[in-house]
Amino acid sequence: MQSSKYRHRLPQLGQKLFATDGGMETTLIFHDGIPLPHFAAFDLLRSEAGIAALRSYFERYVRIARDQGVGIVLESATWRASSDWGSKLGYDAQALADATRKSIGMLLEIRDEFETPATPIVISGAIGPRGDGYVAGARMSPTEARDYHRVQIETFASTDADMAAAFTLNYVEEAIGIVAAARSVAMPVAISFTLETDGRLPSGETLAEAILRTDQESDGYAAYYMINCAHPTHFRHVLQQGEPWLQRIRGIRANASRRSHAELNDSADLDAGDPQTLGAEYRELRDLLPKLSVAGGCCGTDHRHIDAMCRALKAA
């Protein structure tokens, strides 16, 4: 029987600020020069050098959290570790499960070494979309999404991970299915939608529609919602009405770049933006999101951006 530390009392649901990491894949590719076929960071777990690169990556953020006196949510390197993406890299179901457990195990070791009372460390199993994160292509029904993602979520539940979190979701049915799969194994789950430059999901749905429908279809089971892989200038306007559904948003993992998803997809370079400016934009977002407690980054962000976010939010 597993004994997770925070599964039944996620500390980021309180008032304390929690950091996350930045854009893992873009950092590894553009800063560290590590190729990641299909953006699959979990593939690094098959070599000692890859494991060392991932551990070094995570420890950099943990040290920032400790220096700043904030908590941190560590997301496993498993955004691509589901069956469709794994098969593209030659992984069968058992190999994917082994990689998933290894990814969580590494984060547990980091927690054992670095956690302090002032810096609680939450271990989260990262889930990615079945398809392209930027395009709402072939859409699953909620039942199909539940069945597809259940295998990965069951693997997370069998470890000492505290929760699961699904990132870069671009249509609501996939979110509903993921929440249902997590609920079936009593695993806390956060849902993070990605938004286009108009503040809508790639499917055309509004953020309000996505959150409210997911909650309606799952009896509000999701622990909280997030926004990721979009720049604050793309979605700030949808947060300015003060509606009750905004209380469900606790996390932001923004891009460093103001580029659209299409522009990012076609870009051969990394637009890292300005860390201090992004930090200031997070401080403005906190005024619009009363429950914001989880701050991290997505494409183009690195440790500099997370440090700036923490400093700005602590000063707010």
Q: What do the PLM-derived regions correspond to, one by one?
A:
Residues M1-A316:
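Domain-level signal for soluble alpha/beta catalytic cores
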